[in-house]
Amino acid sequence: MSVPEEEERLLPLTQRWPRASKFLLSGCAATVAELATFPLDLTKTRLQMQGEAALARLGDGARESAPYRGMVRTALGIIEEEGFLKLWQGVTPAIYRHVVYSGGRMVTYEHLREVVFGKSEDEHYPLWKSVIGGMMAGVIGQFLANPTDLVKVQMQMEGKRKLEGKPLRFRGVHHAFAKILAEGGIRGLWAGWVPNIQRAALVNMGDLTTYDTVKHYLVLNTPLEDNIMTHGLSSLCSGLVASILGTPADVIKSRIMNQPRDKQGRGLLYKSSTDCLIQAVQGEGFMSLYKGFLPSWLRMTPWSMVFWLTYEKIREMSGVSPF
């Protein structure tokens, strides 16, 4: 064995396989954040489906009056009518999704920042580069994770279907994957991918770009160091911006992914994300695009804090340089 090979074997795993290590660390941090904040995500999804105007086209009272009003009453209604643990319905595919999504977006963003775009000599990273990098990272990560996101959204609505007397569509996560694949083929697993990546581009422009920009601004221009205080302040900002930018696209995405489909996998309510946008605004008003904003913001902010604090800490513990 040559000397370089022997030296490489002695290096820590994080140095031998840096991208794979960052992918796994991102997935671990995202799993912690998802488990902690998932009930807010479920509440948000239920709110976004309430009073859906396009359901009137299906007839037979398909569009029902909203059973709950507001975030708190929606959450309490789920607990009273379905049980406390139903607040985590769909969490398994959500974790699957974030292992792929967060791993993909974080590795992509860092690669673009360090290798493709590059920082200036004074370690400054221009905002326009960060915006493009954040959007590209979101698109790539979300496209890879679309099948798991589709299953998550549909499973989150199963409890509501049961209360409405409708048959359940899935027995579990793996049955959901198998059924969607059988009914719509590979294409069916990527239903709603266009609004999904549109949302991911906006959310990551808010999350990754804001966190990276605020953090490095604080480190380079204030007495604050690269520590938990800086990470916390940066993540608070990123959670707010991500919610403002991402909620309208999230409403469109959720509706397209949850709509009934024909045998060819085509949606019965919306032809495209643009069609869904137009129907929502015309039938329910502009503010329908911000249905679920409060739980989205209340979820995104703690999610962002838990994720970034966990991610920075486990990078430090694993011997990986700070983000």
From Swiss-Prot:
Q: Which GO terms describe its cellular component?
A: apical part of cell; mitochondrial inner membrane; mitochondrial membrane; mitochondrion; neuronal cell body
Q: What are the record keywords, sorted?
A: Membrane, Mitochondrion, Mitochondrion inner membrane, Repeat, Transmembrane, Transmembrane helix, Transport
**SUBUNIT field:** Homotetramer.
Tissue distribution is: Found in adult and fetal brain. Present in most of the brain tissues, with low levels in spinal cord, corpus callosum and substantia nigra.
Per the record, membrane topology reads: Multi-pass membrane protein
Q: Which residues form the signal peptide?
A: none
* SUPFAM superfamilies noted in UniProt: Mitochondrial carrier (SSF103506)
Inhibition and activation profile: Proton conductance is up-regulated by unsaturated long-chain fatty acids and inhibited by purine nucleotides ATP and ADP. The transport of chloride ions is partially inhibited by long-chain fatty acids.
GO terms for molecular function, please? chloride transmembrane transporter activity; protein homodimerization activity; proton transmembrane transporter activity; transmembrane transporter activity
Which PROSITE patterns does this chain map to?
SOLCAR (PS50920)
- What's its catalytic activity? H(+)(in) = H(+)(out); chloride(in) = chloride(out)
Instruction: Name the major location.
Output: mitochondrion
Solcar repeat placement: 21-115, 125-217, 226-317
Kindly list the biological process annotations in GO that this record carries.
inner ear development; intracellular triglyceride homeostasis; negative regulation of mitochondrial calcium ion concentration; negative regulation of mitochondrial membrane potential; negative regulation of neuron apoptotic process; positive regulation of cell population proliferation; regulation of D-glucose import; response to cold
Q: Which Gene3D superfamilies match?
A: Mitochondrial carrier domain
| Entry coiled-coil feature ranges | none
The places in or outside the cell where this protein is found are: Mitochondrion inner membrane
- What this protein is called in its record is Mitochondrial uncoupling protein 4
- Transmembrane ranges, per UniProt, are 23-40, 88-109, 127-144, 195-212, 229-248, 288-311
What the entry lists under InterPro entries is as follows: Mito_Metabolite_Transporter (IPR050391), Mitochondrial_sb/sol_carrier (IPR018108), Mt_carrier_dom_sf (IPR023395)
Protein family according to the UniProt entry: Belongs to the mitochondrial carrier (TC 2.A.29) family.
This chain's function reads: Facilitates proton transport across the inner mitochondrial membrane and may dissipate excessive proton gradient associated with oxidative and metabolic stress at neuronal synapses. Regulates glutamate-induced proton conductance in astrocytes, shifting the energy metabolism toward aerobic glycolysis and lactate transfer to neurons for ATP synthesis. Can transport chloride ions with lower efficiency. The transport mechanism remains to be elucidated.
Q: Which gene encodes it?
A: SLC25A27
